[in-house]
Regions:
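N-terminal export/targeting and maturation segments
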Residues: 4-81
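Aromatic- and glycine-enriched beta-alpha-beta binding-site module
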Residues: 35, 132-134
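C-terminal partner/receptor-binding element of secreted or periplasmic proteins
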Residues: 125-128, 135-136
Length: 136
């Protein structure tokens, strides 16, 4: 009986901490971005070229440079000389940002159903922004 209450307190504290960490990772730090304020680029011949897009949905978090995610439809073709990106690795985003499915994008990149291009190099040291382009 003497150890039950402290054990119960420890278990409840662990569950509360786990819920807090989960919430912070899924919802706490992310912000939806205004589509008008999102600048989409692709590197072509060593220079960033702006991309025109519609249906832009984007999220970001101040806590990490790798939390930026966006889904969009290009309104035109990629510019001549767009730089392909070798070995892209889509990172999993929050579940509620349903337009971005990292697993599907990874599968499509590996199968050739989508192509990866360098969007913006060195957003932060060793962090590149990459876009996956589908043929449609």
């Amino acid at each position: 009986m003497n150890g039950r209450i402290p054990a119960l307190v420890l278990i409840c504290a662990a569950v509360a901490a786990g819920v807090g960490v989960w919430y912070a990772q899924e919802y706490g730090f992310y912000d939806r971005l205004d589509p008008a304020g999102v600048t989409l680029t692709v590197m072509a011949q060593g220079k960033p070229v702006p991309l025109a897009a519609r249906e832009v949905q984007a999220i970001d978090a101040d806590s990490s440079p790798i939390r930026w995610r966006a889904c969009f439809r290009l309104t035109g073709a990629l510019p001549e000389g767009a730089e392909p990106f070798s070995q892209p690795t889509p990172l999993i985003g929050p579940r509620w940002f349903s337009c971005f499915d990292a697993g599907r994008i990874d599968t499509d990149l590996k199968s050739g159903a989508a192509q990866a291009y360098l969007g913006q190099p060195e957003v932060r040291p060793d962090v590149d922004r990459v876009i996956a382009v589908y043929p449609d």
